[in-house]
């Protein structure tokens, strides 16, 4: 049964690690949460109430 050289295992590990990181980055950055407009309006009003008018 043939055996792989250590550099073969290293290159295989590096290739799969890069593929795993790219896959996770694509999944992370493709997610866009949807916020209803009513919540967006309430959020802007709540931040405006924090600005004190001295």
Curated annotation (Swiss-Prot):
GO cellular component, one term: proton-transporting ATP synthase complex
Record flagged with keyword Hydrolase: no
Subcellular location: Mitochondrion membrane
Known partners and oligomeric status: F-type ATPases have 2 components, CF(1) - the catalytic core - and CF(0) - the membrane proton channel.
Family per record: Belongs to the ATPase protein 8 family.
Any one biological process term the GO annotation gives: proton motive force-driven ATP synthesis
Role description: Mitochondrial membrane ATP synthase (F(1)F(0) ATP synthase or Complex V) produces ATP from ADP in the presence of a proton gradient across the membrane which is generated by electron transport complexes of the respiratory chain. F-type ATPases consist of two structural domains, F(1) - containing the extramembraneous catalytic core and F(0) - containing the membrane proton channel, linked together by a central stalk and a peripheral stalk. During catalysis, ATP synthesis in the catalytic domain of F(1) is coupled via a rotary mechanism of the central stalk subunits to proton translocation.
Main location: mitochondrion
GO molecular function list: proton transmembrane transporter activity
Annotated InterPro entries: ATP8_metazoa
Gene from which the chain derives: MT-ATP8
Keyword Ribosomal protein: no
Keywords linked to the UniProt accession: ATP synthesis, CF(0), Hydrogen ion transport, Ion transport, Membrane, Mitochondrion, Transmembrane, Transmembrane helix, Transport
Recorded topology in the membrane: Single-pass membrane protein
Transmembrane domains' residue ranges: 6-26
Protein's recorded name: ATP synthase protein 8
């Amino acid at each position: 049964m043939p055996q792989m050289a250590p550099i073969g295992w290293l290159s295989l590990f590096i290739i799969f690690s890069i593929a795993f990181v790219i896959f996770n980055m694509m999944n992370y950055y493709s997610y866009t949460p949807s916020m209803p407009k009513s919540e967006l309006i309430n959020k802007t009003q709540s931040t405006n109430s924090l600005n004190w008018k001295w």
